[in-house]
UniProtKB/Swiss-Prot annotation:
The gene is lrgA. PANTHER family: ANTIHOLIN-LIKE PROTEIN LRGA, HOLIN-LIKE PROTEIN CIDA-RELATED. One of its GO terms (cellular component) is plasma membrane. InterPro entries: Antiholin-like_LrgA, LrgA/CidA. It is a multi-pass membrane protein. One of its GO terms (biological process) is programmed cell death. This is Antiholin-like protein LrgA. It comes from Staphylococcus epidermidis (strain ATCC 12228 / FDA PCI 1200). Disulfide bonds: none annotated. Inhibits the expression or activity of extracellular murein hydrolases by interacting, possibly with LrgB, with the holin-like proteins CidA and/or CidB. The LrgAB and CidAB proteins may affect the proton motive force of the membrane. May be involved in programmed cell death (PCD), possibly triggering PCD in response to antibiotics and environmental stresses. Belongs to the CidA/LrgA family. LrgA subfamily. It is found in: Cell membrane. Its main location: membrane.
């Protein structure tokens, strides 16, 4: 009996060590860099133009969902990048300022374009969330109430 308990404790420690395995910042950055490299390769073969960063986000999401990449392998670097996102957008802001003469040619059209694209994004997001709710990916209260009386 004591041997079984000790074996169980050793197995639990091994599982805990795997869960708490720490990855260095270099390893985490390398993981993200490899995903971005793969997304750049995919981008070069795609018939429609799509940014490699968007492809990389989708690849990272799929890798996290399937368990190919563990959250611990990208969490610290991902959090650091998210915390400094404002600083990372500075080059984009500078390029907009450099393009100011082009933007001055039709400011009303640009403002109208921003408003329309924002509304389209909101509408698409709303329809997508409604689709997810109706397709039972997120169970509604009615289904939970129907199944709750079965067990008891």
């Amino acid at each position: 009996m004591v041997i079984l308990e000790q074996t169980h404790l050793v197995k639990n420690k091994a599982v805990d060590n795997k869960k708490s395995m720490k990855y260095s910042i270099f390893q985490q950055a390398l993981t993200i860099a490899v995903i971005l490299l793969i997304s750049k390769i995919i981008e070069s073969f795609m018939p429609i133009p799509m940014p490699a960063s968007v492809i990389g986000l989708v690849l990272l999401f799929i890798a996290l969902c399937t368990g190919i990449v563990k959250l611990g392998q990208v969490e610290t670097v991902g959090t650091a990048l998210t915390n400094n996102i404002g600083f990372l957008f500075v080059p984009a802001g500078i390029s907009v300022i450099n393009s100011l003469p082009i933007l001055k040619q039709s400011p009303i059209l640009i403002i109208l374009l921003i408003i329309i694209s924002t509304l389209l994004l909101l509408i698409c997001t709303g329809f997508s969330s409604q689709l997810l709710v109706t397709k039972s990916l997120f169970p509604s209260k009615e289904k939970n109430e129907e199944t709750s009386h079965i067990g008891g």
